[in-house]
């Protein structure tokens, strides 16, 4: 059992999605960036490769006293706009999602965190590195809000978002999502095979 799963030499950052029904407003993820850190006192070489084919960016000076902030951009442009990290909720099985995300490689173990702001809210997701590789996964989520309590002015139930983001690390890999009978939800989730 590995107890330090967040530190790794390789991190796979899959695409994320915006909330369904939030094309405008304060829930759009802006100020998106990767935050890289390490316990190493020596300089670590890190390469960040966008999965859309853009040129990689290499840093030679990551250390415990010098974390790196890699700016991704904003999804706000008079409404939701996809970035290299966030894809539209209606394109999670399309070209946007296939070309989004990042591969982060370092010559020494590092931490990689996704951070973003959305209006008065903020979010962060921590990569699990090589410890997250595998072929079988389970996920559980809590329900968000109540459709019976929602009102017209602030329909939290329709804008809350729980999702799973999966990324194949080898070409021509088939990713299948099997939903058990116990699943509870308002929206049908589709299986995407690439």
Task: State where each predicted segment sits.
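Intrinsically disordered, low-complexity linker/terminal regions across diverse proteins
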Residues: 5-194
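Bacterial N-terminal signal peptides
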Residues: 1-2
């Amino acid at each position: 059992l590995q107890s330090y799963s967040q530190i790794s030499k390789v991190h796979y950052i899959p695409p994320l999605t915006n909330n369904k029904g939030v094309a405008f407003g304060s829930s759009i993820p802006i100020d998106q960036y990767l935050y890289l850190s390490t316990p190493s006192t020596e300089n670590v070489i890190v390469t960040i490769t966008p999965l859309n084919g853009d040129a990689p960016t290499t840093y030679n000076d990551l250390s415990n006293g010098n974390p790196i902030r890699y700016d991704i951009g904003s999804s706000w442009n008079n409404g939701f706009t996809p970035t290299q990290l966030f894809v539209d909720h209606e394109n999670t099985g399309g070209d946007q999602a296939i070309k989004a995300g990042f591969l982060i490689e370092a010559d020494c173990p590092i931490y990689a965190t996704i951070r973003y702001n959305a209006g008065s809210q903020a979010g962060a997701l921590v990569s699990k590195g090589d410890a997250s590789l595998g072929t079988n996964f389970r996920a559980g989520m809590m329900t968000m809000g109540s459709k019976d309590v929602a009102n017209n002015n602030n329909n939290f139930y329709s804008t809350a978002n729980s999702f799973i983001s999966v990324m194949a690390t080898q070409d021509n890999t088939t990713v299948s999502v099997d939903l058990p009978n116990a699943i509870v939800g308002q929206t049908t989730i589709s299986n995407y095979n690439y």
